[in-house]
């Protein structure tokens, strides 16, 4: 067989083999990169609680007593604290925070509050400006956003897909917007282990609550880790 004919035959065989491999269901394909979702701003309903001059003055006095900070502004947010309301409705939790009365536990002013409440159906309500301190976690109010979730246990919230997803979206957006490390997204029960915990009142230095333990927060932080910050 002439060299030209041999070359043509080899080329034909190579093309045929390549065509069969391309059609083969077992042919290797380039791996598809998994793209993590971006932590964009979720839909937020504005339902501000009264936070006028009187309450701001009370918050300023509270910050002086507990943190040595003569200010009511939240200037350096480094922590996000997750809570649950121990109520069955948004309205009940909202009423508690809107009433600027001494809390039943520590009997201090201003009244307790949180920056957000996430309802059972996943609706996100903002109650307080992100530039103002709220009383939600002893030792961390000076540097923490508070997110309350309507419910009585962490298990309830983890088992409500819409509410759980909304909590993750809101927390991811806040975390990315303010450059808050994932390790600093904590449950209220984890407050004493935060490197940002500070408390000038000696009797309150070990004070915390039972909501959102380390075990309960573990799947939440894992899910938050799936989101990437834009930019």
Tell what function each PLM region has:
Residues 19-56, 153-231:
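Basic/polar, cationic surfaces and motifs that engage anionic cell-wall
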Residues 75, 109, 140, 156-164:
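Solvent-exposed, acidic/flexible segments
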Residues 80, 138-147:
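Short coil-to-beta-strand
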Residues 86, 149-151, 189:
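Short, small-residue-rich loop/turn micro-motifs
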Residues 131, 146-158:
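Substrate-binding clefts and substrate-entry loops adjacent to catalytic sites
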């Amino acid at each position: 067989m002439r060299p030209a004919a041999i070359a043509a035959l080899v080329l034909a065989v190579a093309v045929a083999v390549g065509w069969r491999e391309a059609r083969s269901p077992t042919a290797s394909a380039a791996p598809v990169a998994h793209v993590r979702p971006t932590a964009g701003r979720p839909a937020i309903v504005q339902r501000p609680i009264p936070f006028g001059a009187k309450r701001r003055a009370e918050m300023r006095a509270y910050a002086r007593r507990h943190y040595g900070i003569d200010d009511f502004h939240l200037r350096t947010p480094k922590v996000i604290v997750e809570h649950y309301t121990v109520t069955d409705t948004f309205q009940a939790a909202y009423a508690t925070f809107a009433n600027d009365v001494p809390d039943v536990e520590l009997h201090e002013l201003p009244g307790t509050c949180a920056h957000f409440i996430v309802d059972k159906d996943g609706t996100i309500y903002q109650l307080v400006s992100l530039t103002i301190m709220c009383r939600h976690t002893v030792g961390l109010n000076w540097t923490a956003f508070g997110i309350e979730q309507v419910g009585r246990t962490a298990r309830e919230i983890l088992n409500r897909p819409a509410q759980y997803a909304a909590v993750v979206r809101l927390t991811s957006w806040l975390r990315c917007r303010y450059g808050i490390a994932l390790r600093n997204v904590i449950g209220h029960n984890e407050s004493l282990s935060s490197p940002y915990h500070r408390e000038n009142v000696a009797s309150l230095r070990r004070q915390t609550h039972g909501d959102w333990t380390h075990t309960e927060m573990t799947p939440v932080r894992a899910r938050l880790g799936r989101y990437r910050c834009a930019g």
